Swiss-Prot record:
GO terms for molecular function: electron transfer activity; FMN binding; oxidoreductase activity, acting on NAD(P)H as acceptor; oxidoreductase activity, acting on NAD(P)H, quinone or similar compound as acceptor. Keywords: Flavoprotein, FMN, NAD, Oxidoreductase. It comes from Shewanella frigidimarina (strain NCIMB 400). PANTHER family: FMN-DEPENDENT NADH-AZOREDUCTASE 1 (PTHR43741), FMN-DEPENDENT NADH:QUINONE OXIDOREDUCTASE (PTHR43741:SF2). This is FMN-dependent NADH:quinone oxidoreductase.
């Protein structure tokens, strides 16, 4: 049975188009027997990394309660990744980048010695055998252009921790009129339908 982790990152709640698309994917894959866990980073926000927490994530003695809490949370998030075969990331574009909610998650799971390590030839990811699917929504048309900082960034981060099998589903032009929005959502759903579990 495939184990799937879905990460929602929108701050828009029930109005979120990226969340609606991964909910659609959830329905499709659940009906095929996938075991799915959803973590809503917009609804249950993670702490923003600061100097104290960054120091605490390196471990050591005499950590504060706040550092211990962040370290335990980071361990939990990393364990979630390791426990699932496929990671689905719902990533709306906000001002050409990812939501802060998703950046907070990345800052808690990208840990030297835990999800990647440094060698004489550079960094090596430690998360092996995983697949990631990015479901990205945006108001304009940015795919493949210089204004898309979402997909290149997420692909880089995922590859850095060892997840190089990455697929992307785009829903674009969602604020460029009703017809364009309908087309964007329809094309994204067709792409979801075409993905194998």
């Amino acid at each position: 049975m495939a184990k799937v982790l879905i990460l929602k990152s929108s701050i828009l709640g029930s109005y979120s188009q990226s969340s609606a698309l991964v909910d659609y994917l959830n329905q499709q894959w659940s009906s095929k027997g996938a075991q799915i866990k959803v973590r809503d980073l917009g609804e249950n926000t993670l702490p923003m990394l600061d100097g104290e927490l960054a120091s605490g994530l390196r471990g050591g003695d005499n950590l504060s309660e706040r550092q211990l809490s962040a370290l335990a949370l980071s361990d939990e998030l990393v364990a979630e990744i390791k426990a699932h075969d496929t990671i689905i990331i719902a990533a709306p574009m906000y001002n050409f980048g990812i939501p802060t909610t998703l950046k907070n998650w990345i800052d808690l799971i990208a840990r030297a010695g835990v999800t990647f390590t440094y060698t004489d030839t550079g960094a090596v990811g430690l998360i092996e055998g995983k697949r990631a699917i990015i479901v990205t929504t945006r108001g304009g048309a940015h795919k493949g252009g210089p204004t898309d900082h979402v997909v290149p960034y997420l692909t880089t981060v995922l590859g850095f921790i060892g997840i190089n099998n990455v697929e992307t589903i785009y829903a674009e032009a969602l604020n460029m009129g009703p017809d364009a929005a309908e087309t964007g959502i329809s094309q994204a759903k067709l792409a979801i339908d075409a993905i194998t579990l």
